[in-house]
UniProtKB/Swiss-Prot annotation:
It comes from the Bacteria. Pfam families: GIDA, GIDA_C_1st, SAM_GIDA_C. Belongs to the MnmG family. This is tRNA uridine 5-carboxymethylaminomethyl modification enzyme MnmG. One of its GO terms (molecular function) is flavin adenine dinucleotide binding. InterPro entries: FAD/NAD-bd_sf, GIDA_C_N, MnmG, MnmG-rel, MnmG-rel_CS, MnmG_C, MnmG_C_subdom, MnmG_C_subdom_sf. NAD(+) binds at residues 273-287. Its cofactor is FAD. It is found in: Cytoplasm. Signal peptide: none annotated. The gene is mnmG. NAD-binding protein involved in the addition of a carboxymethylaminomethyl (cmnm) group at the wobble position (U34) of certain tRNAs, forming tRNA-cmnm(5)s(2)U34. Transmembrane segments: none annotated.
Length: 630
């Protein structure tokens, strides 16, 4: 039967990609359906109970800057917050939060249920309705048909999901959830390149069976950081510590002697796992010279004894898992609540997508999250927000949008995926961004919120807060620029006493702040300025201290932007361009880049080939002008 009303956008899947996609579409005023196999698992953290980290927090704050839910849900559920790389420069600093799994999920569900224009329905999706290479809707497990001209598929690990524990395996989307095998079969009928990837999770431990006295305590930071630009520390629940222990020679011996029982090393698993989050058996095999590996003992929440031992993800048989866990200091008597496992699943080559995350071959069909070959909640959420936004823009008859590499880590993520593809689960790092001094986590709102408002993603409350912050930064910069300190005056002497730097002549406070030894808080203390919003103070200090470097990056971006944004015609035939080698013609035909900048990042496409493309475009443009004037 057909559902009685029609939707404009349908989102399949209620994980981190699906929730952000559905919320983005609905925030833009588009009638949106979120289809999930189980309402109780909306926003569920399938793996580790943490949000953020190096490169990842930048994505979380960009999602937040565009009105998304992830950062706010983290502030309301975070039970430990830390800033990583705190002693390094602002470009690589990253906020990481340990979350209470149950609270996080409850917050996400509450946000979803209170979002106007969003309907939620519990049913698995078994089929897509496709007519003349255009998606028209979906069919659920019970045969119910929903119609919409845009569908966002965020299937996570559910497409053809196969769970492995030792040499035993069974179908599943994750532990306790069924796979989406009917949909996986339907997807394989479409003209899209499909592959298999793998990820894994460690056994969960009962905290009552662990001896924390022999472990190293790892408390959170003070003052407690926040994740959302709209958040504050008062939102956080009770804060707790994590703990650190290590594997040892005995642990490694147990693993090495049982590799023949590992599905990874016996050839049972075909999919490639995440390079930067390897299983413990992978670590022992690849880093045989290391005597030990860190294990972070992370609490799963405030109302459970379950612990997540980050660092020992494994798919070895249960008896071996028990031996491994009990060989680690502090866990000699540990009770395993849930065994670790690996899961294989289908993903689709992201080179078959446009920048909007719409597939090139099926109009209106968008992919987001692990289906595109990524790993991580943050990467999924970022793609979900972008896909949901573009599905809504399509419904509204507006042009699609994707930030450039110099505008957002979301832009870096998407450009990497659709240009280079991936043969292993893709994880974001700050090192992937060429312009990371500009793309800091602290200025995500200044980079993206204005665009979010234009797109319809930002509500009035967030917009008012953003405008107040932006005006506050301009006002404080102007005050520092126009306030002068002279040698021999009480203020001048206070500056000398505070920082130990003599004043040769008069300086503006902005000039003084640019000095490496001068910090904003100390300068205000010495000169008697008023205490301002910490977010404003942070921006003023970073912009002043790194002004020269930031200006140079902006100049470089401006130089490259002209050719970067030059669009390549949809109907361009690369085989007719003289001078291009057959190999490069083949690469360009396969990838079908949208811009000259994207073409330049395809492996094997040389600068000389880009010059030939530019010449071809100029000739083509001149030829069309002559035709029009004739």
């Amino acid at each position: 039967m057909d559902f009685p009303s029609r939707f404009e956008v349908i989102v399949i899947g209620g994980g981190h990609a699906g929730t952000e996609a559905a919320l983005a579409s609905a925030r833009m005023g588009v009638k949106t359906l979120l289809l999930t196999h189980n309402v109780e698992t909306l926003g569920h953290m399938s793996c580790n109970p943490a949000i953020g980290g190096i490169g990842k927090s930048h994505l979380v704050k960009e999602i937040d800057a565009l009105g998304g839910a992830m950062a706010l849900a983290t502030d309301m559920s975070g039970i430990q917050f830390r800033v990583l790389n705190n002693r390094k420069g602002p470009a690589v600093r990253a906020t990481r939060a340990q979350a209470d799994r149950a609270i996080y999920k409850a917050v996400v569900r509450e946000i979803l249920e209170n979002q106007p224009n969003l309907w939620i329905f519990q049913q698995s999706c078994d089929d897509l309705i496709v007519e003349q290479d255009q998606v028209k809707g979906v069919v659920t497990q019970m045969g119910l048909r929903f119609f919409a001209d845009s569908v966002v598929l965020t299937s996570g690990t559910f497409l053809g999901g196969l769970i492995h524990i030792g040499l035993q395996n069974y179908s599943g989307g994750r532990a306790g959830d069924p796979p989406a095998n009917a949909l996986a079969q339907r997807m394989r009928e479409l003209p899209l390149r499909v592959g298999r990837l793998k990820t894994g999770t460690p056994p969960r431990i009962d905290g009552r069976s662990v001896d924390f006295s022999v472990m190293t305590e790892q408390p959170g930071d003070t003052p407690i950081p926040v994740m959302s630009f709209m958040g504050n520390a008062a939102m956080h629940p009770r804060q707790v510590s994590c703990w650190i222990t290590h594997t040892n020679a005995r642990t490694h011996e147990i693993i090495a002697s049982n590799l023949d029982r590992s599905p990874m090393y016996s050839g049972v698993i075909e999919g490639i796992g995440p390079r930067y989050c390897p299983s413990i058996e992978d670590k022992i095999h690849r880093f045989a010279d290391k005597e030990s590996h860190q294990v972070f003992i992370e609490p799963e929440g405030l109302t459970t004894h379950e612990l997540y031992p980050n660092g020992i993800s494994t798919s070895l048989p249960f008896d071996v898992q028990l031996e491994i866990v009990r060989s680690i200091r502090g866990m000699e008597n540990a009770h395993i609540v849930r065994p670790g496992y690996a899961i294989e699943y289908d993903y689709f080559d992201p080179r078959d997508l446009k920048y909007s995350l719409e597939t090139k071959v099926i109009g209106g069909l968008f992919f987001a999250g692990q289906i595109n070959g990524t790993t991580g909640y943050e990467e999924a959420g970022a793609q979900g927000l972008l896909a949901g936004t573009n599905a809504a823009l399509r419904a509204q008859g507006r042009e699609s949008w994707c930030p450039r590499r110099d505008e957002a880590y979301i832009g870096v993520l998407v450009d990497d995926l659709i240009t280079l593809g991936t043969q292993e689960p893709y994880r974001m790092f700050t090192s992937r961004a060429e312009y990371r001094l500009i793309l800091r986590e602290d200025n995500a709102d200044l980079r993206l919120t204005e665009k979010g408002r234009e797109l319809g993603l930002i509500d009035d409350a967030r917009w008012a807060a953003f405008c107040a912050k932006r005006e506050g930064i301009e006002r404080e910069e102007q005050r520092l620029k126009s306030t002068w300190v002279r040698p021999g005056t009480p203020q001048g002497q206070a500056v000398v006493d505070k920082f130990g730097t003599p004043l040769a002549h008069e300086y503006s406070l902005l000039n003084l702040l640019a000095r490496p030894e001068v910090d904003y808080a100390g300068l205000i203390e010495a000169t008697g300025g008023e205490v301002i919003d910490p977010q404003v103070a942070e921006q003023v200090e970073i912009k002043t201290k790194y002004a020269g470097y930031i200006d140079r990056q902006q100049e470089e971006i401006a130089r490259l932007r002209a050719s970067e944004d030059t669009r390549l015609p949809v109907d361009i035939d690369y085989t007719t361009i003289s001078g291009l080698s057959k190999e490069i013609q083949g690469k360009l035909e396969q990838t079908r880049p949208e811009t000259l900048g994207q073409a330049s990042r395809i492996p094997g496409v040389t600068p000389a080939a880009i010059s030939l493309l530019l010449i071809h475009l100029k000739k083509r443009g001149a030829g069309r002008e002559l035709e029009q004037s004739a």
